[in-house]
């Protein structure tokens, strides 16, 4: 544990941010997984609906700095290509 007062505060802040980032990443993975499952099932309408949710979550995560904006773009692009191939 840190001895400096400001560093003790930063430890608490970092823990809070870590929990928030883990929660965002978890919901992001769930949304992407739902899209991939709809694609695997061959249901284009469901895949497009799931993609809309996943794309929104990817953009929000990138905006919050949880993931890099290029990673969000690459994931959205990969999902879109898979949906268009249906």
UniProtKB/Swiss-Prot annotation:
Please provide one cellular component term from the Gene Ontology annotations of this protein. cytosol
Q: Which domain of life is it from?
A: Bacteria
Q: Name one Pfam family in it.
A: Ribosomal_S20p
Q: Does the keyword Ribosomal protein apply?
A: yes
Keyword line: Ribonucleoprotein, Ribosomal protein, RNA-binding, rRNA-binding
Choose any GO biological process term that the UniProt entry carries and state it.
Answer: translation
- Stored InterPro entries: Ribosomal_bS20, Ribosomal_bS20_sf
Which GO terms of the molecular function aspect are on file? small ribosomal subunit rRNA binding; structural constituent of ribosome
Query: What family is this?
Result: Belongs to the bacterial ribosomal protein bS20 family.
Q: Which PANTHER family match?
A: 30S RIBOSOMAL PROTEIN S20 (PTHR33398), SMALL RIBOSOMAL SUBUNIT PROTEIN BS20C (PTHR33398:SF1)
Q: NCBIfam families given for it?
A: S20 (TIGR00029)
**What does this chain do?**
Binds directly to 16S ribosomal RNA.
Protein's recorded name? Small ribosomal subunit protein bS20
Name the species this protein comes from.
Bifidobacterium adolescentis (strain ATCC 15703 / DSM 20083 / NCTC 11814 / E194a)
Gene encoding the protein: rpsT
């Amino acid at each position: 544990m840190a001895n400096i007062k400001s560093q003790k505060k930063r430890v608490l802040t970092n823990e809070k941010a870590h929990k928030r980032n883990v929660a965002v990443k978890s919901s992001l993975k769930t949304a992407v997984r739902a899209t991939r499952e709809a694609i695997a099932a061959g249901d284009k309408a469901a895949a497009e609906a799931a993609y809309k949710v996943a794309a929104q979550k990817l953009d929000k995560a990138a905006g919050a700095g949880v993931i890099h904006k290029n990673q969000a773009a690459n994931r959205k692009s990969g999902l879109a290509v898979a949906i268009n191939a249906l």
